[in-house]
Amino acid sequence: MSRVGKTPIVIPAGVEVKLNNQVISIKGKNGELTISVHKAVNINYTGNILTLAARERVSDGWAQAGTARALLNSMVIGVTEGFTKKLSLVGVGYRAAIQGNILKLALGFSHPIDHQLPLGVVAECPTQTEIILKGPDKKLISQVAADIRNYRRPEPYKGKGVRYADESVRLKEAKKK
């Protein structure tokens, strides 16, 4: 049995939960997120507490309940506080700038890279070599950060490229004669 799935989720004040069969919508000050929960999970919402449990005679019910609880908890955190992901650009001439909803990157290619930010993601560039992504959806923020990082991943010899702010790149030793 999943210990994560058994833990109730306390819904803070200012967050509205709508339950429609297996579809849950959570609305807060940062926006609204919707998720479809697996049919092996029973959902109970009373007062300000949301609990999940496995249905009878379903083999993976508690596993699905644990997954759904973790996703719902991150949705509640997202609509109340939001999520941030920081990226740093390391390399000579590597720069980032924001123009409206487009992130313009100069990463050492012969052409600049224009990355269209999806709805629900806000980017900031406090310096030319830092990018901060903000939004309520943790999955979307992480996916956008991974897409930006994939334009120029940190290379193992000098460490140049786009990296997460908390990422440490292990450098290899150069070939010796």
From Swiss-Prot:
Gene Ontology terms: biological process: cytoplasmic translation
Annotated Pfam families: Ribosomal_L6
Gene Ontology CC entries for this record: cytosolic large ribosomal subunit
Gene3D superfamilies: Ribosomal protein L6, alpha-beta domain
GO function terms (MF aspect): rRNA binding; structural constituent of ribosome
Purpose of the protein: This protein binds to the 23S rRNA, and is important in its secondary structure. It is located near the subunit interface in the base of the L7/L12 stalk, and near the tRNA binding site of the peptidyltransferase center.
Protein family membership: Belongs to the universal ribosomal protein uL6 family.
NCBIfam families linked: L6_bact
Protein name per Swiss-Prot or TrEMBL: Large ribosomal subunit protein uL6
Organism: Hamiltonella defensa subsp. Acyrthosiphon pisum (strain 5AT)
